[in-house]
Structure formats: C-alpha cells, structure tokens
C-alpha cells in the first residue's frame, strides 16, 4: 500500500510539475465559435471536432508537445496525426502548432489569500469617577427652626449621597 501511495504521488508530481497548466487553443480554419478553447495540460480534449492533448516534457517544465488525434483515444499508445514540440516563454505569445493550430500558454491564477481575523477585539471603557469635595452645607441664617423634618431628610440625603460617592 505504501508503494502505491508513493507511485501516485510521484505520478502527480510529474503531471503537474509544469508552470503552465492550460493552453488557449485555436483551430485556424474554423469559425470563431471554435477559435478559442482552453485545453488543460495532459487532458484529451475535443476542439472543433478534433481531439488534442498537450503533453508535458519530463525534464523541462516549460516545454510541451502538442498532439492531435483522429479519435478520442489520446493515449501514448496511439500515434497522433499531428505533433509539435514547443517551449512556453510567457502568457501572450502564440505558438504555431502545425498548419491548422496555434496555442497560447496559460497559468491558472492563484487567488490572493483572504485574511480573516480569528478574534475580534472588544474594547470596554473603564470609567473611574473622581471624588469631589462637597462642602458641608451651611445652615441658613434665615431659618429659625432647628431639628425640623426637612432638615433631617436633607442631612440624611447628604449622608447617603456621600456614602454612594465613596463606594464609586
């Protein structure tokens, strides 16, 4: 089982080691509907009724062989009707691939990573009240009543207010 996993990993490495992974393929003598078909590297694809495949080179990551087959049997055992080896240099140059075909090497764009914060900080303001010195009320000079209920309530309210302030 370990050998099988190693073989699959090696095979996928050889298949996808190339920098260019698809090709915009044009059949020159066809109508515009068939003029621009994207063909993935190493995948047998029908383009305008014909079958093509871009075979990557095992030693040069930018070199490919374009192959056209008469049937959908795009395998190594079947001899292609047309072959042409070329080297990709950029994503804009068109390569002549026989008398009828041309292709432009392409690289699948990798999206920029999305950064998602894992923790959203929460800021809770802390307010510390500053105690103020409240002057003691001076007795009113106009009042002649001492010990009245209103004075007791006012004094009691002042004491409670002072206690609440001291707790904060």
Curated annotation (Swiss-Prot):
Molecular function (Gene Ontology), one example: actin binding
| Compartmental location | Cell membrane
| PTM section of the record | O-glycosylated in the repeat region. The oligosaccharides contain N-acetylglucosamine and fucose as the major constituents.
The processes (GO biological process) annotated in the record are: adenylate cyclase-activating G protein-coupled cAMP receptor signaling pathway; cell-cell adhesion via plasma-membrane adhesion molecules; GPI anchor biosynthetic process; mannosyl-inositol phosphorylceramide biosynthetic process; regulation of sporulation; response to catechin; slug development involved in sorocarp development; socially cooperative development
Compositional bias (Low complexity) at which positions?
A: 116-131
What do the Gene Ontology cellular component annotations say? asexual spore wall; cell surface; extracellular region; plasma membrane; side of membrane
Signal peptide segment: 1-19
Q: Which residues are glycosylated?
A: 110, 114, 116, 118, 120, 122, 124, 126, 128, 130, 132, 134, 138, 140
**Highest taxon in the source lineage:** Eukaryota
Annotated sequence repeats reside at 116-119, 120-123, 124-127
Say where the lipid (GPI-like-anchor amidated glycine) is covalently attached: 147
**Lipid bilayer topology:** Lipid-anchor; GPI-anchor
Q: Please give the residue ranges the record annotates as the region 3 X 4 AA tandem repeats of T-P-T-V.
A: 116-127
For this UniProt record, the keywords arranged alphabetically read as follows:
Actin-binding, Cell membrane, Glycoprotein, GPI-anchor, Lipoprotein, Membrane, Repeat, Signal
In the record, the note on similarity to other proteins reads:
Belongs to the ponticulin family.
Give a short account of what the protein does.
May bind F-actin and nucleates actin assembly.
> What is the protein name stated in its UniProt record?
Prespore-specific protein A
| Annotated gene | pspA
């Amino acid at each position: 089982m370990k050998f099988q996993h190693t073989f699959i990993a090696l095979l996928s490495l050889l298949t996808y080691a190339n920098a260019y992974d698809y090709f915009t393929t044009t059949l020159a003598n066809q109508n515009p509907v068939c003029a621009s078909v994207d063909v993935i590297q190493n995948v047998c694809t029908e383009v305008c009724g014909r079958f093509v495949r871009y075979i990557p080179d095992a030693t040069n990551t930018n070199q490919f062989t374009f192959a056209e087959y008469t049937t959908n049997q795009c395998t190594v055992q079947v001899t292609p009707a047309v072959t042409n080896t070329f080297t990709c240099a950029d994503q804009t140059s068109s390569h002549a691939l026989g008398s009828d075909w041309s292709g432009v090497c392409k690289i699948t764009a990798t999206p920029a990573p999305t950064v998602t914060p894992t923790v959203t900080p929460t800021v809770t303001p802390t307010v510390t009240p500053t105690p103020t010195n409240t002057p003691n009320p001076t007795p009113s000079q106009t009042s002649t009543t001492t010990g009245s209920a209103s004075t007791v309530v006012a004094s009691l309210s002042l004491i409670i207010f002072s206690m609440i302030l001291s707790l904060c």
